C-alpha cells in the first residue's frame, strides 16, 4: 500500500504500509503506525487520516470524460513528445527506490575491509571468467579451469592470506584483528528497540490479565497499568540480558575439532566492535597483495603449463589479454587496484609508485612482465607441476607461424644442438628469487618500502630515482631466445647484409619475397587498410608515433615550469600488437573511429588465431576480399599473390651434409659493432656487505641500450626490419632481443673464450677482467681485477654471486646524478653557498667503474644461456 507523501515510519523510515484489522503496519519493520484511523467509503471515494488532517480522493467519471473530450484533437508534435517524456519521467520516479530505503552493503563496513574484499572478489571473478572462456570458447581441456583456481589458491596460501586454519591466531587476544566501526543504524535500532518493548509490554499485560486468578481485584484497584508495567519491565530486563549474552558471543568451529574460537561482536551505542578470528598480520598482508594483470598472466600461464600445454608462451597469454579475449572490463581492473589515495592520506605511500597503480593496463615490454612471472613461479616452486617446454616444439610453432620453409627449422635445431638453450619459464639460470624477496615476503613488507622491494627482488642495489631506469634488470625470456636463434639462422643462411640475397630459381626460397609477405601480414594484423598496403604507389604511415622523450618519460607542469620525469618501470610500451588493451566487448559506447574488423568471432576462436596470429592474417584478408571485392580491384597483383603464397615447401639450398653447407654464410660472417666498455650492471647483495662481495652481475637497461645503440649504425635494412618485426610479434623490446642475439652469437663465434670462462667458474679460478675507473668525464685509470664465484659450484645453474680477488673501493657505482652539487655544477647553476673547493671535492668523490665488454658479457652469456 502506497502512503501519502508525509507518511513515514518512525522506526525505520520506510514509506510502505499495510492495513490489518484496523491498524496500519510498516511493510519493512512491522512497526505500528499510530496516527492512523480507517474510515468508511463514501461517495465512491476513500478517506484516510494522516496526522490531524484528512485527504479526500473522489472519483468523478463524468468530469474526467468531459475533460478528455475538451482536449484538442490535433496537438503539435513537439507538445505530444513533451507530454510523453513527462509521463515517462513521472513513471520512472515512482518506480525508483527512495534513498532512505536503499541500504548499501558497504555502509556498515570499514573502507579498508570493503576494498580488500572487492580486490579478492574481482580478481577471483576475472580468473573464473578467463578459465571458462579458455575451456568453453577456446576449446582448451576442462582441467585448465580447475588448475587456474588451484594455482591462485596456492598463491594466497604462500602469501598467508588464504584465510585458512593456519592463519588464525587461536585464542591469543593480542594477535586478533579487531574491527572498530561506526554503528550507522544506531538511531534506527534505538527506535526499533523502544517500539519492541512497548509492544511486548502490551502483550505481556494482556496475558497476565487473562491468566491471573485475581483479575477482578486488579480491575477494581484502578492501578492496573502500573502493576503490569512493573512486571513487564522485570521480565524484559531478564530476557534482554540473556539475549545480549547470546548475541555477543558466537562460536566458530575451525578445522581443528579440539579448538573453538570465540568471535565477539559488541555494539556499544555509536561504536561497533568486532573481534574476529583472523590475525592482524593476515589482514595486513592481504591489503598489499600483488593483484594485477601481470599476476593474471603468471597464473594463467602456469595453469596452462600444469595442464600439459608445452608450446604456450608467456607472450601468448599477454597477447590474449590485450586482444580482449577474456573480456576484462575497465571496472574490474579498477577494482583490483590498491586504494592508492587512501594509502597516501594515511602516510603509508609518499608517491604514487605502487606496483599495480602506475601502469594497470599491461603497457610493459615482455621482460618487465617476465619479472613478475618469474617471482611468481619461483616463489611457489611450480617447476615440478609444470610440463617442461621443448625447444623443438616451440621452434616448429614459430616457423609455422611465420610461414618459413621446414629447412629453417632443421637449421635452428642444429644450432640448438651446438649451443643448448634453457627455455624454462623459471629462469633459474638468470635470477633466483632467494637473492631478494619472494611473493610472501613482499606481502609482509612495510608499505613505504613495498615498491622498492619489488624492483629489487633479485638482489639489485637500491638506486636513486634519477638513475634507477638505467640499472633495472632485463630478463631474457624463452620467447626472446627463440627469436635470437631464428635471427642467427637467417643471417648464417642468407646474405642479409648484401643486395643479392637468394638464388634466382622458383624452386628455392626467396627471402626478399618472404620479408615482403611478413611486412604485409604484420600491417594486416595491426589493422591497416590493406587496399592501400598492397599498392606500390601508396605510403602507409605507422600507427604508433614515439613520444619525443621516450615512452617511459612524462611531461608535466610544476609551478608554471615544464618538467620531465622518468618512471622507474618501463611503462607506456606500445611496440606490440595490439598496442593497447581492447575493451570493445565490455564498453558501453561504440567506437567512433573507422577501425577495420579483425574477422568474425567464430574465426577468432580458431586455434590458428590463438597460436599463429601472423599466419591467420591470410584467412582474415581472404574473408575481407570476399565481402568487398570491388575495393581490392586496383591492388598490385604481385603483392596479392605474395601475401597468400606458401613458403613451407620451398628449399633453401641443395642437400647439406656439413656445417658449411647448412650455413653457407658462416665463412664470411661479420660481427656488428659492439661497445668497448659496459657499466651499471653490478650490485652488492646488501649495503652492509664488504666491497669485495658478494656481487651480482646482471643485464641492465643501460647495457642493453649501449649495445643496441652502438650496433644500430651497422645494421642492414633487412636485419633491421627482421629485428623490429620479430620483436613486435612477441611484444618485446628490441634491445632485449638483440642482447639475446649477441649472447648466442658469442657462443658461436667466441666458443673458446666462452668455454674458458665456464671452466674457470667451475674450478673457482680467477677470471681476469679489465676495468676503467673514471673520476670525471676526462680522467680515467686502467685497472685489472680477478673475478671468481662466491662459492665453489659444480653446475653453472648454481651460480649466484661473484667475488673480487682483492679489496678495492673503486668498483662502487655512484652515478653522477645522485650528487646534487655535481648536477648544479654541470648545469652551471652553482649556488652561492657551494664553493669551488666543495665542487672539486664532489668531483673527486664521483667514481664510476666500466668493465671490458667482451669479457663481462661473456660471463653473462655463460650464466644466462
From Swiss-Prot:
It is found in: Nucleus, Nucleolus. Transmembrane segments: none annotated. Residues 35-99 are annotated as: B-reader. Residues 100-111 are annotated as: B-linker. The keyword Repeat does not apply. This is TATA box-binding protein-associated factor RNA polymerase I subunit B. It comes from Caenorhabditis elegans. Pfam families: Zn_ribbon_RRN7. Residues 349-496 are annotated as: C-terminal cyclin fold. Residues 252-261 have a biased composition (Polar residues). Residues 239-248 have a biased composition (Low complexity). Residues 233-261 are annotated as: Disordered.
Amino acid at each position: 500500500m502506497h502512503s501519502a507523501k508525509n507518511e513515514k515510519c518512525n522506526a525505520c523510515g520506510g514509506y510502505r504500509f499495510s492495513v490489518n484489522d484496523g491498524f496500519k503496519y510498516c511493510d519493512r519493520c512491522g512497526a505500528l503506525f499510530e496516527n492512523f484511523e480507517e474510515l468508511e467509503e463514501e461517495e465512491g471515494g476513500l478517506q484516510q487520516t494522516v496526522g490531524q488532517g484528512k485527504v479526500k480522493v473522489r472519483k468523478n467519471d463524468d468530469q474526467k470524460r468531459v475533460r478528455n473530450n475538451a482536449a484538442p484533437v490535433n496537438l503539435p508534435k513537439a507538445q505530444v513528445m513533451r507530454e510523453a517524456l513527462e509521463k515517462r519521467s513521472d513513471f520512472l520516479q515512482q518506480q525508483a527506490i527512495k534513498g532512505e530505503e536503499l541500504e548499501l552493503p558497504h555502509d556498515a563496513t570499514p573502507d579498508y575491509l570493503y576494498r580488500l574484499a572487492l580486490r579478492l572478489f574481482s580478481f577471483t571473478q576475472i580468473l573464473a571468467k578467463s578459465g571458462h572462456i579458455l575451456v568453453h570458447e577456446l576449446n582448451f581441456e576442462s582441467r585448465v579451469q580447475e588448475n587456474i583456481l588451484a594455482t591462485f589458491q596456492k598463491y594466497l596460501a604462500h602469501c598467508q592470506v588464504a584465510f585458512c586454519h593456519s592463519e588464525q591466531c587461536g585464542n591469543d587476544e593480542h594477535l586478533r584483528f579487531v574491527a572498530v566501526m561506526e554503528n550507522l543504524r544506531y538511531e534506527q535500532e534505538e527506535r526499533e528497540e523502544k517500539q519492541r518493548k512497548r509492544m511486548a509490554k502490551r502483550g505481556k499485560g494482556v496475558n497476565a490479565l487473562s491468566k491471573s486468578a485475581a483479575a477482578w481485584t486488579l480491575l477494581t484497584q484502578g492501578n492496573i497499568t502500573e502493576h503490569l508495567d512493573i512486571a513487564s519491565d522485570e521480565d524484559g530486563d531478564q530476557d534482554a540480558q540473556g539475549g545480549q549474552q547470546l548475541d555477543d558471543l558466537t562460536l566458530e568451529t575451525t578445522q581443528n575439532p579440539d579448538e573453538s574460537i570465540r568471535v565477539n561482536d559488541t555494539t556499544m551505542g555509536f561504536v561497533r566492535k568486532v573481534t574476529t578470528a583472523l590475525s592482524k598480520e593476515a589482514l595486513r598482508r592481504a591489503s598489499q597483495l600483488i593483484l594485477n594483470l601481470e599476476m593474471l598472466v603468471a597464473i594463467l600461464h602456469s595453469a596452462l603449463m600444469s595442464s600439459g600445454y608445452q608450446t604456450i608462451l608467456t607472450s601468448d597469454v599477454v597477447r590474449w589479454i590485450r586482444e580482449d579475449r577474456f573480456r576484462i572490463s575497465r571496472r574490474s581492473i579498477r577494482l583490483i587496484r590498491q586504494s592508492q589515495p587512501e594509502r597516501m592520506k594515511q602516510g603509508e605511500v609518499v608517491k604514487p609508485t605502487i606496483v599495480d597503480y602506475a601502469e594497470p593496463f599491461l603497457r610493459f615490454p615482455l621482460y618487465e612482465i617476465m619479472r613478475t612471472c618469474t617471482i611468481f613461479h619461483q616463489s611457489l616452486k611450480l617447476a615440478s607441476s609444470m610440463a617442461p617446454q621443448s625447444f623443438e616444439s616451440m621452434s616448429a610453432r614459430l616457423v609455422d607461424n611465420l610461414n618459413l620453409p621446414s629447412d629453417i627449422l632443421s637449421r635452428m635445431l642444429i644450432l640448438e644442438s651446438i649451443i643448448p638453450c634453457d627455455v624454462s619459464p623459471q629462469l633459474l639460470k638468470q635470477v633466483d628469487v632467494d637473492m631478494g624477496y619472494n611473493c610472501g615476503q613482499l606481502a609482509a613488507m612495510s608499505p613505504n618500502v613495498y615498491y622498492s622491494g619489488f624492483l629489487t627482488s633479485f638482489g639489485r642495489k637500491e638506486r636513486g630515482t634519477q638513475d634507477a631506469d638505467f640499472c633495472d634488470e632485463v630478463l631474457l625470456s624463452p620467447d626472446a631466445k627463440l627469436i635470437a636463434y631464428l635471427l642467427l639462422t637467417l643471417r648464417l643462411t642468407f646474405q642479409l647484409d648484401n643486395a643479392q640475397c637468394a638464388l634466382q630459381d622458383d624452386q628455392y626460397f626467396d627471402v626478399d619475397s618472404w620479408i615482403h609477405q611478413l611486412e604485409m601480414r604484420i600491417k594486416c594484423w595491426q589493422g591497416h587498410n590493406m587496399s592501400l598496403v598492397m599498392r606500390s604507389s601508396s605510403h602507409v604511415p605507422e600507427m604508433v608515433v614515439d613520444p619525443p622523450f621516450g615512452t617511459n618519460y612524462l611531461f608535466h607542469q610544476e609551478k608554471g615550469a615544464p618538467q620531465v620525469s622518468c618512471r622507474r618501470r618501463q611503462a607506456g610500451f606500445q611496440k606490440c600488437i595490439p598496442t593497447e588493451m581492447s575493451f570493445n566487448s565490455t564498453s558501453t559506447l561504440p567506437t567512433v573511429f573507422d577501425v577495420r574488423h579483425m574477422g568474425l568471432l567464430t574465426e577468432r576462436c580458431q586455434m590458428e588465431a590463438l597460436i599463429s596470429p601472423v599466419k591467420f592474417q591470410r584467412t582474415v584478408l581472404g574473408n575481407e576480399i570476399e565481402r568487398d571485392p570491388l575495393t581490392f580491384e586496383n591492388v598490385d597483383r604481385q603483392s596479392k599473390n605474395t601475401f597468400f603464397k606458401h613458403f613451407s615447401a620451398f628449399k633453401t639450398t641443395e642437400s647439406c651434409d656439413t656445417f658449411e653447407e647448412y650455413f653457407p654464410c658462416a665463412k664470411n660472417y661479420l660481427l656488428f659493432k659492439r661497445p668497448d666498455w659496459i657499466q651499471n650492471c653490478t650490485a652488492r647483495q646488501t649495503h652492509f656487505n664488504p666491497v669485495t662481495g658478494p656481487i651480482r652481475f646482471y643485464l641492465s637497461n643501460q647495457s642493453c641500450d649501449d649495445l643496441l645503440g652502438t650496433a644500430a649504425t651497422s645494421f642492414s635494412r633487412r636485419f633491421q626490419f627482421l629485428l623490429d618485426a620479430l620483436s613486435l610479434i612477441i611484444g618485446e623490446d628490441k634491445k632485449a632481443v638483440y642482447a639475446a642475439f649477441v649472447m648466442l652469437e658469442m657462443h658461436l663465434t667466441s666458443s673458446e673464450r666462452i668455454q674458458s670462462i665456464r671452466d674457470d667458474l667451475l674450478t673457482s679460478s680467477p677470471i681476469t677482467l679489465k676495468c676503467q675507473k673514471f673520476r670525471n668525464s676526462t680522467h680515467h685509470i686502467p685497472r685489472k681485477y680477478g673475478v671468481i664465484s662466491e662459492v665453489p659450484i659444480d653446475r653453472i645453474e648454481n651460480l649466484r654471486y661473484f667475488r673480487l680477488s682483492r679489496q678495492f673501493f673503486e668498483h662502487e657505482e655512484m652515478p653522477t646524478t645522485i650528487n646534487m652539487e655535481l648536477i648544479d655544477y654541470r648545469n652551471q647553476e652553482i649556488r652561492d653557498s657551494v664553493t669551488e673547493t666543495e665542487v672539486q671535492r664532489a668531483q673527486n668523490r664521483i667514481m664510476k667503474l666500466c668493465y671490458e665488454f667482451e669479457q663481462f658479457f661473456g660471463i653473462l652469456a655463460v650464466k644466462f644461456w
